[in-house]
């Protein structure tokens, strides 16, 4: 909870007759949506919501975003129980917003972020063994279609060199020609080609739907904003189902949407692929 002193400071910072921080962020979000940069728009939206809570709804001009303000916001995030990487995420977004404001001459160049962490701590990459992959594949999920889909997506990712969930969600039938999957990673734009091996083909055929352009029943529309919202809901649901699958395996493990990618990389390294 904000102190009386902090509340008084925020009220005194409220901007008049200039572009304020939250207003500027809303404009940036609108521009990103118009450019179909929906992932970045989503991150800005999360940060704006968080910052609005910190400011208790009182918008401020960029001239008031100084080292003291950033320090108080940093402390606010920590008090909410966020880990260092999460705090850094919000700081990096706000720094990007601030730098855009500098380029648009809304504020004089400065660096109020000097005393806060804006890096990314390395997290432990959790891979599972080929034995666990085999156990997962053999699970009888005939009466649990949602779990079966989550399992099949995980196996598909593993068999396609760790294809990311976002790329699986957006994968279309048109991406498959002459027994080869070709697609561009949505994160990097990197073009990849993967041969459709029997295990991959079996999963693709299991979810074939004549009326859908997509390979898997994850997205239902090609409209960018609606498709992105469906993807956001789907990845959360996918990770929830993977937690349930983890509890069904004999070996103690934790499956996430990243595990299949790390597991493939580990297996490839072990086999000198």
Task: Indicate residue ranges for each PLM-predicted region.
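N-terminal DNA-binding module of tyrosine recombinases/phage integrases
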Residues: 1-49
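Conserved tyrosine-mediated DNA breakage-rejoining catalytic core shared by Y-recombinases
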Residues: 115, 170-206
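Basic, Lys/Arg- and aromatic-enriched nucleic-acid-binding interface segment
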Residues: 116-165
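Active-site/catalytic core of tyrosine-dependent DNA strand-transfer enzymes
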Residues: 133, 197-252
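Short, basic (Lys/Arg/His-rich) helix/loop patches that form interaction surfaces
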Residues: 144, 239-273
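N-terminal core-binding DNA-recognition domain of tyrosine recombinases/integrases
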Residues: 26-39, 49-124, 139-142
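DNA breakage-rejoining catalytic core of tyrosine-based enzymes
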Residues: 64, 107, 120-138, 190-197, ...
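Short, charged phosphate-coordinating catalytic segments
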Residues: 99-107, 157-178
